[in-house]
Amino acid sequence: MLSAKVLLNSNFLRKQCPLCKSYFWTRRADQIYCGDQPCVPYGFIGNPPTKTSIESPAELRERFLRFFERNGHVRIKRYPVVARWRDDVYLVGASIYDFQPWVTSGAVPPPANPLVISQPSIRLTDVDKVGRSGRHLTGFEMMAHHAFNYPDKYVYWIDETTQYAYEFFTKELGIPQDEITFKESMWEGGGNAGECFEVLVRGLEVATLVFMHYEVKDGKYVELPLKIVDTGYGLERIYWLLKGTPTIYDAVFSHYLAKVRQKVGIPEPPADIMGRASIYFGQMDPEVIGLDKAYDIIAEKIGVDPKWLREVVRPQEALYVLADHSRTVSWMIADGVIPSNTGAGYLARLLIRRILKNLRVVGIDAPLVELFDMHLAELKREYPEIWAARDLILELVDLEEKKYREVLKSAPAAVKKALEEARRRGRAGLDTDDLVALYDSQGIPPEIVAEVAKSLGAEVKVPDDFYTKLAARHAKREKKPESPLVEMSKVADLPRTRELFYEDSYMRSFKARVLRVIDGRYVVLDQTAFYPEGGGQPADRGVLKFQGGEAKVVDVQRVGHVVVHVVEGQLPPEGAEVVGEIDWERRYSLMKMHTGTHVLIQSIRRVLGPHIWQAGAQKDIPSSRLDVTHYKLPTAEEIAKIEELANKVVQENLPVYVKIMPRNEAEAKYGFILYQGGVVPTREIRVLQIGPDEEPFDIQACGGTHLRSTGEIGLIKIQKVERIADGVVRFVFTTGMHALAYIQELERKLAEAAHIIGGSREEFVESVKKLLQRAEEAERRAKHYAELYAAVVAENLRAEQIGKYRVAVVELNDDELAKHIALAATRRDKDLVLVFVGGDRVTIYTGGVDVTPVVKTLREAGFRGGGSKTFAQGLYKGDIQTLKEALKKALS
């Protein structure tokens, strides 16, 4: 049983709902049901439970935050919607995501305790219900207060949390005490769990109070050292409750919807019809009974024709989807997501295409970029970061709409091919797996697949929860299974390796003691200057020297808290003292590459925009690569600007600092741009700063070895820029002497090319232009002479009369000349069948004769190929005489 003092002291009664069997608390002796959907209908639509006047979600948010500030909480800024500090999910789905796993595990203290926040969150778990149910959103703000109770520090728990909720709803919002129900439940998410109260008012869940004290491990609950108050008050839900509008969209997006309706010519729906439809939709699950059936049931309950109801409701659903999804997508892009076919970009594209699909169904053809821009104008006051990204958002949305239209053009052929493949496998139509494959591989929405299939005489059933299932498949990051170099059990008892490469990255040699030799090739030292592979930087190489021998170090890896050296040659005995010598030339080159990577990505961000995030990197010799998120291939001018800025930073010889900072302090000071290189799983963060404190050029969390100043890089040269995936661009670059060697090699090739065409390097471009002009003139003349020759050959063809057709077989191994001859010959003789034989290739041209029966007969003689009605080509390994006989047989 879950209870609280405020409930016991305020005359609440504990009851059990006869329908769902849940226990709940209410002050009303006559309340029978739990107060939640679907056990009770909405009771607030057209009838808000309070007269408290709140004119906007922004005003409600501020009242919530101030209420908790008055009650001893520290207000903190919202986190991004992209969870860059986590390696398990892409998007923030609740305010507690901000603190998982580092704070909730006890590894890192919270930024304040207790704290209050209003966190934009994204959940696609009910994406198919958005627009239909009247209450579901993909993007929402979770207002929340959190308290973190440690064994030695109690903040507050169930009693105080419930008291705060009770006072906020009754005193701050003026909702009568008898209207509030506390329903007991269990919550689980993000690897944690705990009992909870769901706060309900007139059938609507407006808050959840979670008392988190479990970690979920292998499906079992394990007690956490912390007891965490994790609350979630739905900003949009509460505002809807206060307004009593037919749907949540009409409350939250009222101004935007009014403008869109006016632009696209869709009238505002009858409020009573939409309100009643929303009430009934709230009590059923269309995914279970089917959307069409749901419409029929609701129409019957309201007393209207189902067809009329669809005509009224369906256009509104499309506009609701537009309103919700456009805000969610704008949040995502403003926080650095580029629509693509992978990761968070996949989810952004899914939402954009769902908007386009819904607008298409109801016949709205207004440019999506214009509809988005209207919404951005509405959002700019509450979310200035969205307005700051306006140009990027509109450019990406416009690009995505163009891609979608291309998809629609290619859909018929792709669906036809998929149906043919299904029939070959003995299936009459396409199943859900086929729909997923067509969407993931070619971006074709299932509704379009169904349309095309129907035109081809096949029925395709589109699941009502199709997009929800798609989103679930792509919501989590894929973790690559780790296989440690040696078993943890073999090093678990050893002390942590002292990491000399961090104390002095310029250390070339060092002394150490051998703690353990494992499996005849792995050596663990008490301290090392050998850098273990990590963060895209390869491991150091070198030697270990000891009395009586020497071992070559060929690899270095971290295994838990120790550094393991992979060696070849003689093995040092355990307990021996060794001298480690780093391959300094290689290490120093890698340091230049690593510091150069930081300089380069910041240069790319400053030229292409703040949406640039690292998607991967590998430092190597003589070249390194840096993958970044970007929606198109940079122009030559942009690449030149990036290279110029990077080398300007090198020339300025900016200092490079390493700071060890507490995680919270670093995040508060620098933001989540720290995690360009990925998640850092430590309580303290090693922060690399390029440039002085008053004006740093770049700041990132990084565990690599770096230079003392940018001048040591010497030179940064971009060698190649290519698009390696949808939304990902790769920069291949080099630094220092390797860059000089690359430039010298280019100059050598340029000089060689200039010599070949007869000119100097300085005159190379002009020489190439003249050479191309001569080549074009020669090609033009060759074509002219070929046409003249072809006309002569065509006029003198020796053709044999076979039936009513004339047949000529010509041995010629020149496709281009054959085309010219065929064009000239078939233009003057429509009954001509002209066959060219060149090696084992056969090509047939006609002036209008159907070659289909000819090809069929030739196949019997060994011909393998096909073509159109008047043209065929393929392979034939027989003799010409057999070919002629087959032609006679076919044309006689």
Curated annotation (Swiss-Prot):
Subcellular localization(s) per the UniProt record: Cytoplasm
NCBIfam families: A-tRNA_syn_arch, alaS
Organism: Pyrobaculum islandicum (strain DSM 4184 / JCM 9189 / GEO3)
Residue numbers binding Zn(2+): 594, 598, 702, 706
Record note on cofactor: Binds 1 zinc ion per subunit.
Name the record gives this protein: Alanine--tRNA ligase
Cofactor(s) needed for function: Zn(2+)
Gene: alaS
Keywords: Aminoacyl-tRNA synthetase, ATP-binding, Cytoplasm, Ligase, Metal-binding, Nucleotide-binding, Protein biosynthesis, RNA-binding, tRNA-binding, Zinc
Single GO MF annotation: ATP binding
Coiled coil feature spans: none
GO biological process, any: alanyl-tRNA aminoacylation
Cited function: Catalyzes the attachment of alanine to tRNA(Ala) in a two-step reaction: alanine is first activated by ATP to form Ala-AMP and then transferred to the acceptor end of tRNA(Ala). Also edits incorrectly charged Ser-tRNA(Ala) and Gly-tRNA(Ala) via its editing domain.
Enzyme Commission identifier(s): 6.1.1.7
Domain notes: Consists of three domains; the N-terminal catalytic domain, the editing domain and the C-terminal C-Ala domain. The editing domain removes incorrectly charged amino acids, while the C-Ala domain, along with tRNA(Ala), serves as a bridge to cooperatively bring together the editing and aminoacylation centers thus stimulating deacylation of misacylated tRNAs.
Superkingdom assignment: Archaea
SMART domains: tRNA_SAD
Pfam entry (one): tRNA-synt_2c
Keyword Zinc carried by entry: yes
Family membership: Belongs to the class-II aminoacyl-tRNA synthetase family.
GO cellular-component term (any): cytoplasm
Main location: cytoplasm
Record has tRNA-binding as a keyword: yes
Catalytic activity as recorded in UniProt: tRNA(Ala) + L-alanine + ATP = L-alanyl-tRNA(Ala) + AMP + diphosphate
